[in-house]
A protein has these predicted regions:
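Extended, low-charge, aliphatic-rich alpha-helical segments
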Residues: 1-93, 97-99, 105, 135-443
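Alpha-helical bundle protein-protein interaction modules that mediate dimerization/oligomerization
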Residues: 95-97, 102-103, 117-132
Length: 443
């Protein structure tokens, strides 16, 4: 694995990437493909003047009028270490007299790159643009075979190729407003949000456009401090050219930070309803009988006693939770009689729906229970497990899955979603190759 993302960011104690992505050459081709109809619409609007009132015979204004605009070629290619090249060829149909028409070809060659502005937002910048205008054929010419440079200045003035070059980036479907949407905050739970912040302008390699991101989490609108990863995340370079449009990568530290944010928001503090009652417990723990006069359902109220931790191995993701369960009874007035430390190691299942990563607890792999405090005398470890392990094994995954049921938004730009997703879990990181899909417009 070669280090790509770490090259983007100087060593810094507070700004360190924990995820990122590579937009591949095939992804660029897809963006060009879906931008082509958009570009044709924009050029048609800009170049074709609205129908004007019928001019007088003496008026020269009817001499040249663009009557059709068709984008014949629209391509985006990668220029390693530099940026992207946008190549456009547009066929124009022009009337130069009531019965005479001619076709011209407008060719645009523009070099683009994504920069980071002083506000920290990514923006598309045009570094070079070369427009040319050629006459292809005319009804007034006998030889229509070969295109040649147009010598008429009228069309140059009417088309205003310089203005087209100044605004060439708007011909793409991801203008700066959409690039800025990459860094928008996304909800995880009602009180917890995630935000992906670009750390630097992207890099350009033969594999694609590489961007490094730092994740921040907000709880109740405030960014929470999270431990910085001791090892800066490095984007793994694909072994070969990937057929996927985009490859997202997330470090082990990202997942640990996510669960730490959920802990900070209180989302992991849950109540687990047991199938036990105070009467059934009294049959096994004799001192229970003197505490409760009526038969009440037993509840386990769990709180985190230290930060969770996620471990990524080949084909396996494990979250380790360190909880304390207050075991008690009473709905209106909860009365605790036991406190148990619960250490859980649970396997995570990862999938993607639209632009969200769905994280769920697939199975609990290991649970350790130890008595912390007791108001009903000493209790053997074996009895603790017999009484409470079934509830913990069933309810802890159910409650965490309930917290994460909405999923965690992936880095994405507005109007695009992800398809053909293939998630692979490796030691220390997760790779998500996927394809882009332009969402259908509604309304």
């Amino acid at each position: 694995l070669s280090i790509l993302l770490s090259l983007l960011v100087p060593a810094h104690t507070t700004r360190s990437p924990d995820c990122g992505g590579i937009l591949t050459p095939s992804g660029l081709r897809y963006l060009a493909e879906v931008s082509k109809p958009h570009a044709e619409s924009v050029l048609r609007r800009d170049l074709m003047a609205p129908p004007a009132p019928a001019p007088s015979p003496a008026s020269p204004s009817s001499r040249n009028q663009i009557i059709s605009v068709k984008v014949d070629k629209f391509s985006l290619t990668l220029i390693p270490d530099t940026g992207m090249r946008l190549s456009i060829e547009v066929d124009l149909g022009i009337t130069s007299a009531p019965s005479a028409t001619k076709e011209m070809r407008l060719s645009i060659l523009a070099d683009l790159h994504v920069d980071m502005n002083p506000e920290g937002n990514l923006e598309l910048v045009t570094s070079d643009c070369k427009p040319t205008l050629e006459e292809v054929q005319s009804t007034e010419e006998s030889d229509r075979s070969a295109p040649h440079k147009s010598s008429g200045l009228d069309m140059d003035k009417q088309i205003n190729v310089e203005k087209i070059c100044l605004e060439v980036s708007k011909l793409l479907l991801f203008p700066n407003e959409r690039l800025m949407s990459l860094a928008a905050p996304f909800p995880i739970t009602p009180s917890c949000q995630v935000q992906y912040l670009p750390l630097a302008a992207p890099m350009y390699s033969e594999q694609g456009i590489i961007i490094s991101l730092q994740t921040t989490f907000q709880v109740a609108g405030t960014v929470i401090p999270l431990p910085v990863s001791p090892v800066p995340f490095s984007m793994p370079e694909p072994a070969s050219s990937s057929p996927s449009h985009l490859i997202l990568a997330f470090s082990e530290h990202f997942y640990t930070s996510l669960f730490s944010a959920l802990e900070e928001s209180g989302a992991l503090n849950v109540s687990l309803l047991s199938s036990l009652t105070t009467a059934t417990l009294a049959e096994r723990i004799t001192q229970m009988g003197s505490l409760f006069q009526e038969d009440l359902p037993v509840v386990l109220q769990t709180v985190t006693r230290s930060s969770p931790h996620v471990v990524l191995e080949e084909d396996k993701a494990i979250v380790k939770l360190f909880l304390t369960a207050q075991i008690g009874a009473g709905s209106a007035l909860f009365q605790s009689f036991l406190s148990v430390n619960v250490d859980v190691a649970a396997r995570l299942h990862l999938s993607v729906a639209d632009t969200r990563m769905i994280i769920s607890v697939a199975a609990i792999e290991d649970v350790e229970l130890s008595l912390a405090t007791s108001d009903v005398g000493p209790i053997m470890a074996a009895l603790l497990e017999e009484l409470f392990l079934p509830t913990i094994r069933e309810e802890v995954p159910a409650q965490i899955n309930k917290v994460l049921r909405q999923g965690v938004f992936l880095p994405h730009i507005a109007s695009f979603t992800y398809t053909d997703v293939n998630i692979t879990i490796h030691k220390d990181y997760v790779l998500i190759p996927c394809n882009l899909q332009l969402e259908a417009r509604t309304g």
